[in-house]
């Protein structure tokens, strides 16, 4: 763990003033900021500098000078964003306040990626100070998640645009200088390239406005490419317009928009609409006169079907190009000068070191199944094989295998929504109406009204207030926003009705009847279904705003509520694309690992019924969920806000809590955890590593999922399935089963990374189960990984392993789900601590938590795991079911998403090769059966040659020999042997016992 260097005593006393002097000098001399702004920034700096000087700081840099620079940037960014939001843009006239985030970073010699990586630590520490200075809604006004998402999207889109431009156009007008796919990225890109990007940025500012989702922005970029193809002089073209294999013909001419729609997987209707917006933008901003392309004669339009196209004379002529670029540059500068946001021109600047080369999520940015750092503008050679390279078109449009990218994957998923869901009727089908009308009373009208209100809350329209606030924007901006919101509401509504009908059919078969009154009259169930549908629509379009958990806040449900429907939703929508299934499963993982355990979760309401012994602790900590806001309350907020974003979270927290004791349910853990996976949860899809948890859903659970009607029934109601359980007990049993499955995956990953024995794996797993069952309160307000990490260290101590907490944390950092906040900020209630020297709630590092909270509670359970641990110490204060708690189950077999058999005719599997499988699979007698990517199968060979050999064997017409060959290097492996070898064998959960020690912080 890299932590801040300790400050010297002189720095802590007499050096404090010099710290403020350096900050003031940085503001005034380094950035030429105005006096009023410097005064406000100095106020925040002085209020927070004790945190900078604290020995407990955890910003991941080494030198004190580096720490200061980060802190300077964080303070200035926060003040810039929050003071402007508070003042309502009243400081626009003060030139000393007109600066962007990029200017601050350049002054501090930092890059964007490192800024986003360390910002959560600043927010965690300075959050209370920001709340005191700027109000409780400071985090939403700061918009860090949105800014980070925007950066990720633009990183992808800029690579997408650069690749497409280099395929379509030359760097110069000389045809001999055509760039190849392997040419150097240092090639100078002409003004046409910059013009296109600036036009795209102008489109984002003036037309897309609030809803800058990835799909809409991709349509915008493709529209810009169309403008360039029409107007860039023919001598710069790198394509032949007569190439029938690349372009769609309409008669004897090329249909340009249809061609681009096919190549880049866009909707041709959306492309036409966006083209109209671009044309209007050029007319208004560049003062160019539009002409019907069909009435204009120019070499650029030869062999193009000009129907519906617009042409601007002199738009790309060299005499006018510089002026147009300058106009767009000024327009963009004016638009961002006082917003403190990113200067999005950095993505096409020649000097792009400001972008950085780090990563943004748990050590790596997870994009479409690969971990990839943000590169500077990658060379064509790199992007050809990169999974981040844009859709390879037009040259590869007809290729059998085109590598998927985040952008192309998003467009493919959007096509599913457009072709499968959009054509459906925006009302209940006849079959669904039959179920709705078969209840004790007809609930059709209720279902329709609820859907309208909830989806309006999730996808609000722009109100008159926003129309006025959009000064300087085109008049069509608000109209575009409203059209976007209406389209998304319609898609979510149709998906909701479709899945609801399928679920009703399945439930009726379970219950042997059409009367589903208990389910179809359950308000919470319907809101969960609507939230799930809306989240899929948002995930498909990859929005910058309304990131998860926005759907929870706007529908009034909790994480525990949503976790009940995700599995059923996936199961009952068979057409759901694989990437959306992954998205829902990644959400479920996020819900289970921490969000369900946070204050205000409805899980605690069920847990208090299922485990009465925990009720007092749950009430003491104020963990119970508040009543769900009524539909009328949500509708009122929609109407009062005139379509602006309704402040439902405050309604949920305050209006329905007259005693005022619950207050803000957000914990520092939640604040920071939301930044760790902006890319994973929304801006890209989860990796196959996460699919290990999805695969666990196939493991037979001890507690089968209950029927939906019982999952959403009152916690105290008897389970209609029998067994003498209440619905709360059934729900908690199912929930605990999911937690144990998720823990099994993560424990196994750490075991493999630490190269520990299967016996240790079994012991850690047994301990985790015991803690969940008998020390459930240790999970309250915490992340399950915190319990897992402490369990590893506790088991290491009783097993006399030479394993330090530092080694555990270092290896945890390499896990795909790692969040630094897990070990940097653990909730503690000092009233329950071993050394009760402080009072109240606090957040400490994981070693302090282990010593003060974990070991005093778990030590008896650790002793029980040892052969001789059944005499000295017994557990006499179980949280759960008492001494009669069921014996922990052995470690389950964890199927990988692989092995994947390539085809029925080839005896070839593809599977991740873990260290635990290596010895079993790669023996001397069977080595030729396996090809390890990155490790040659023969001497002096390369991985690329290995892959060529594999492909040739799979694709070639190999003649089978008539005689059997018993040579070592020949033969086949049976399917059963391969399948069985890929499952880890169960071990023994017993291990020798040693004295349970506490961990000392390591220097």
From Swiss-Prot:
Its primary localisation, in coarse terms, equals: nucleus
Gene Ontology cellular-component terms listed: chromatin; nucleus; transcription regulator complex
In this chain, the stretch annotated as Domain A covers 405-607
Region described as Spacer = 608-729
Region entry Pocket, spans: 405-860
- Which UniProt keywords are given for this protein, alphabetically ordered? Cell cycle, Nucleus, Repressor, Transcription, Transcription regulation
Keyword Cytoplasm attributed: no
Q: In which tissues is it expressed?
A: Expressed in roots, stems, leaves and flowers.
The compartments listed are: Nucleus
Q: What is a single molecular function from GO for this protein?
A: RNA polymerase II transcription regulatory region sequence-specific DNA binding
Among the GO biological process terms of this entry, one is:
negative regulation of G1/S transition of mitotic cell cycle
Decide whether keyword Nuclease is in the record: no
Renumbered residue ranges of the record's region Domain B: 730-860
Residue ranges of the region described as Disordered: 868-899
Extra remark beyond the main annotation:
Plants undergoing virus-induced gene silencing (VIGS) exhibit clusters of undifferentiated cells around mature stomata, indicating uncontrolled cell division from meristemoids, as well as increased ploidy level in some cells.
Q: What does this protein do?
A: Regulator of biological processes that recruits a histone deacetylase to control gene transcription. Formation of stable complexes with geminiviridae replication-associated proteins may create a cellular environment which favors viral DNA replication. May play a role in the entry into mitosis, negatively regulating the cell proliferation during leaf, stem, and flower development. Critical regulator of the endocycle.
Q: Which family does it belong to?
A: Belongs to the retinoblastoma protein (RB) family.
> Could you tell me what this protein is called?
Retinoblastoma-related protein 1
